[in-house]
């Protein structure tokens, strides 16, 4: 069965749904459980016209994200092996994490709304990641 499960979260309230699903599967399989959050690369969003210290902004975001991942991990009764914080292209960061940490199941969420039909990051991941995926529907109200 699975040996290492990675749960991709966006740090919204729905992240706990995904984490609980991952913890339940990990417990049944006796697998390691890890979390990952991917931030966009801020330097790609700004042009040279804006004078801003991107490294200090990025450092602050990384620190806040790490704290949020730690807090999320405390909300379940299963140990979280790794709390990963990536930056850049969502699909590429997940591919690299899957390879580096020997992940054999990736859990992501998918919003079933109008915009997700056109711009789904999960669909791109499905086309690139070479391990099993569990895509959990997140129903928008």
UniProtKB/Swiss-Prot annotation:
CDD domains: USP-A-like (cd23657)
Keywords tagged on the record: Cytoplasm
Subcellular location as annotated: Cytoplasm
Principal location listed in the UniProt entry: cytoplasm
SUPFAM superfamilies: Adenine nucleotide alpha hydrolases-like
Pfam family, one: Usp
One GO cellular component term noted in the UniProt record for this chain: cytoplasm
Superkingdom: Bacteria
Entry keyword Cell membrane: no
Coiled-coil stretches: none
Keyword check for Chloroplast: no
Protein family per UniProt: Belongs to the universal stress protein A family.
Biological role: Required for resistance to DNA-damaging agents.
Record's subunit section: Homodimer.
Protein name: Universal stress protein A homolog
Name of encoding gene: uspA
């Amino acid at each position: 069965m699975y040996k290492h499960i990675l749960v991709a979260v966006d740090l919204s309230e729905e992240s706990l749904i995904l984490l609980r699903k991952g913890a339940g599967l990990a417990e049944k399989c006796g697998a390691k459980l890890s979390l990952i959050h991917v931030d966009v690369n801020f330097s790609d969003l700004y042009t040279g016209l804006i004078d801003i210290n991107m490294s200090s902004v990025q450092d602050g975001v990384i620190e806040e994200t790490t704290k949020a991942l730690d807090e999320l991990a405390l909300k379940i009764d299963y140990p979280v092996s790794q709390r990963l914080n990536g930056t850049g292209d969502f699909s590429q960061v997940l591919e690299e994490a899957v390879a580096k940490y020997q992940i054999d199941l990736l859990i992501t969420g998918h919003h079933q709304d109008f915009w997700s039909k056109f711009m789904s990051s999960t669909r791109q991941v499905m086309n690139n990641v070479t391990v099993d995926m569990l895509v959990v529907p997140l129903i928008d109200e």
